[in-house]
Amino acid sequence: MKIIDFHTHIWPDDIAKRAIEKITNTTPGAKAFSDGTLNGLKNSMNQAGINCAVILPIATKPTQVETINNSCKNLMSDRIVPFGTIYPKTKKFPKDIEYLANIGVKGIKMHPEYQNFYIQEKKYFPIYEILQHKDLILVFHAGKDPGPFLGDHALPDAIKKVHQNFPKLKIVAAHMGGWMLWKQVEKEIIDLPIFFDTSATRRWIGTERFLRMIKKHGTEKILFGTDSPWFNQKKDVEWLYTLKVSWEDKEKIFYKNAKELLKINL
């Protein structure tokens, strides 16, 4: 079985240790399963049997955007698909998105909690319009956050509003549509033509609910993801293998959906 992990994080070697320590110190229960570096991710992938990983950076300050996006070119490989970043409260985002599109980046990650913005506010619609026009993928951190945040910046009904206004925008709502808000997800967005990834759900969602949700939403819109380094990639792979899901559907979730969405060879 080929496997694409659609939701991973790394940091430059010189700051990875510091970044890991900062997050573990501010997030209850957080534990890293790699050292947060590119090599650490690759080692974890090897142990888990993962062929390819999507890296999702987050600019928590406007000054970080250019450095992160410039690193994308060096990260691109058969095994690594780096996404870019923007800082939504600046007016620089059209230039940043244009740059990412020109160098072949597949999409961007937005973290409404870390970046402190409400995704449904109309002042952010120009971002979605450009991404839709450029045919780039938008990954939202969706739902609550285990860190010191309110967790109301990307609720299921807000994701629905973004989709309704930009129906051709390729949206990935991380954490099965909304971390710890799966009742709302099932009510608001379960059957919309957007993708969910499975990251950071194994410990909390429950097998019965997970199986019900992927059946209702459609396995063709589910992407395997782990949120590495914060979750053990090998255990997440093993978990999905054990579920009572057909081999055909496991292939879709593990790699076929992501391969088609990313338009890559594997």
Where are these regions (language model features)?
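Mid-to-C-terminal alpha-helical segments outside catalytic/metal-binding sites
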Residues: 1-10, 15-52, 216-221, 234-266
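Conserved, mostly hydrophobic/aromatic
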Residues: 7, 45, 72, 100, ...
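Histidine/acidic-residue-rich catalytic or RNA/ligand-binding cores of hydrolases
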Residues: 15-18, 150-158, 181-190, 206-215, ...
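Divalent metal-binding pocket/active-site signature
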Residues: 35, 59-63, 88-91, 102-186
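Acidic (Asp/Glu)-rich catalytic clusters
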Residues: 42-49, 69-81, 96-105, 125-134, ...
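Short, well-structured secondary-structure segments
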Residues: 49-64, 77-86, 109
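Short acidic/histidine-rich active-site segments
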Residues: 175, 199, 217-234
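His/Asp/Glu-enriched short active-site or ligand-binding loop at hydrolase and phosphoryl-transfer sites
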Residues: 193-205
